[in-house]
């Protein structure tokens, strides 16, 4: 699970350039409405499909099961399309350049797991959040030496290099030290989170810092190996800036973004979203419908 792809971190310039060509130049047959004006719900119904672009490599949000895209996001989009009376046209693309393809009207929505940032919100309509991406810590199951995030002094902590979780982890260590505590014995970074979790399982590190949703999924799949560090009430302890996960729609396509938001709201109210969260992450999460876009 390559978290930095999802939450706005930079990649190499050459990779971005190649992916932009793939997303913009090579998808002329994939796309949504080529009209110069805003895309309307009537046009989507006339087309008979909602075209959604993602990178199906981020389990459990979206990933390939044989030749089909499945996951948490896929389940939500399937319900949205059912309610709209259209087919779900899912496109699997490299993540870099995927937003450029949205601007070029090659598809209707970017339904990848996007972290909500001020920069993205200035360019696109970011839908209501569908998950929590704030940084949490995972320890080995039964490690009683870590009862809360205040017990991390002297511990080895791992995370993925060049992602916002690394920044949050460094800042939390600085907070511990500013309070007169020792702080981590070591902060190690890895090329991927699966590598970090393998090191945790093998006892080479004591904690892994990653976004909440992904950690919940890891713990659900490996309940005998890992657990999230929680407070006395059993609630996950989070550090850093609140980070929410949502999707991107073109600014001018207000009918579509309003419809998607109304569906997310409905799924929250009728319990559908909670059921899907429990299915894919093991537990339900409270999600905001306002004040979820960070300040500049």
What residues fall within each predicted segment?
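Extended ligand-binding regions for polar small-molecule ligands
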Residues: 31, 74-83, 143, 150, ...
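Ligand-binding clefts/hinges and TM-proximal coupling segments of bilobed small-molecule sensing domains
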Residues: 32-38, 164-187, 227-228, 261-296
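Bilobed "Venus flytrap"/periplasmic-binding protein-like clamshell domains
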Residues: 51-59, 69-82, 134-192, 212-214
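Periplasmic-binding protein-like
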Residues: 131-139, 222-262, 283-296
